[in-house]
Swiss-Prot record:
It comes from Salmonella choleraesuis (strain SC-B67). SUPFAM superfamilies: YccV-like (SSF141255). It holds the Pfam family YccV-like. SMART domains: YccV-like (SM00992). Involved in the degradation of certain denaturated proteins, including DnaA, during heat shock stress. Gene3D superfamilies: Hemimethylated DNA-binding domain. This is Heat shock protein HspQ. It is found in: Cytoplasm. NCBIfam families: PRK14129.1, yccV. One of its GO terms (cellular component) is cytoplasm. One of its GO terms (molecular function) is DNA binding. The lineage of its organism: Bacteria, Pseudomonadati, Pseudomonadota, Gammaproteobacteria, Enterobacterales. Keywords: Cytoplasm, Stress response.
Amino acid sequence: MIASKFGIGQQVRHSLLGYLGVVVDIDPEYSLDEPSPDELAVNDELRAAPWYHVVMEDDDGQPVRTYLAEAQLRSEMRDEHPEQPSMDELARTIRKQLQAPRLRN
């Protein structure tokens, strides 16, 4: 079993670009069907580590879904981001859904 550093609903930052994002899914290793030429350059060790589906905002404030290696992310310590309230709301909504009890029929 591979342990992931970040959890679903957690806010993270891209370690090089500084973009704020929210983890929406986790793969235990690289799992896209057909890698692009840029993704082919990723070494095997990085491919074997967890990869994250992260929602970030583009320059126009529109949501963009990205696929990033664990090494490309760092924890975000602040919970409130007045400059990007939609990312705060997305993180809260996901965490709330994960904590909500599920009814069984």
